[in-house]
Amino acid sequence: MPNLLEKTRKITSILQRSVDSLETELPYNTMASRLADIIDCNACIINGGGSLLGYAMKYKTNTDRVEEFFETRQFPDAYVKAASRVYDTEANLSVENELTIFPVESKDIYPDGLTTIAPIYGGGMRLGTLIIWRNDNEFSDDDLVLVEISSTVVGIQLLNLQTENLEETIRKQTAVNMAINTLSYSEMKAVAAILSELDGNEGRLTASVIADRIGITRSVIVNALRKLESAGIIESRSLGMKGTYLKVINEGIFDKLKEF
């Protein structure tokens, strides 16, 4: 039977795995699943807004109403607010506690159900909550040590991802600003007209038609597109007689054009 050290190593080894994006569907399923296996419980991880980041169900404990929270990947506001007021791990909460994960309609079915809540911090900020639960049997001190470690590991990953996302946002904003600064007034006018022709972030356009409509030469449009493409703002592909296919890959250009 694995001892506490071996269990800890299994959890901390997750730090060696990368979570590419918080936009990924349920990016923390691996952590929740590993914790559920090691501690023998159900587990889920939510962010500060109550969105589900990952979960693992070893045992059936919930009704259809609660299962819907997991299907929609969003916990109720009332529960999220109550959980956000937990600043240290709250262990072995009974089915009568407001933080129990067991639904009120199943209290008689699981009278000995126990829930443990652990806040997730990173860089001094509250980033989310780790929730584990069992139908019976209290969580031991060893279990709670693993919960604390797990919440720390998730906190580190969340903080790193937020930092990476911020750096990527700054990089894109800088690229847009630099590209805009190279455009003449006529080219800016052309870019605004071009992007308004797109269906969302991509579409087909004919430079000569746009040039005639806004009263500029076709070469101005071509130069503007070339500058945006070299800056990594757009991708384009000639369609021959049908015009040009255009795709915006840095959406910051739309916000910048609102200032034009």
Curated annotation (Swiss-Prot):
GO terms for molecular function: DNA binding; DNA-binding transcription factor activity; GTP binding. GO terms for biological process: negative regulation of DNA-templated transcription. The keyword Transferase does not apply. Residues 207-226 bind DNA. It comes from the Bacteria. Disulfide bonds: none annotated. The keyword Transcription regulation applies. GO terms for cellular component: cytoplasm. Signal peptide: none annotated. Residues 1-159 are annotated as: GAF domain. Keywords: Cytoplasm, DNA-binding, Repressor, Transcription, Transcription regulation. It is found in: Cytoplasm. Gene3D superfamilies: 3.30.450.40, Winged helix-like DNA-binding domain superfamily/Winged helix DNA-binding domain. Belongs to the CodY family. DNA-binding global transcriptional regulator which is involved in the adaptive response to starvation and acts by directly or indirectly controlling the expression of numerous genes in response to nutrient availability. During rapid exponential growth, CodY is highly active and represses genes whose products allow adaptation to nutrient depletion. This is Global transcriptional regulator CodY. It comes from Streptococcus equi subsp. zooepidemicus (strain H70).
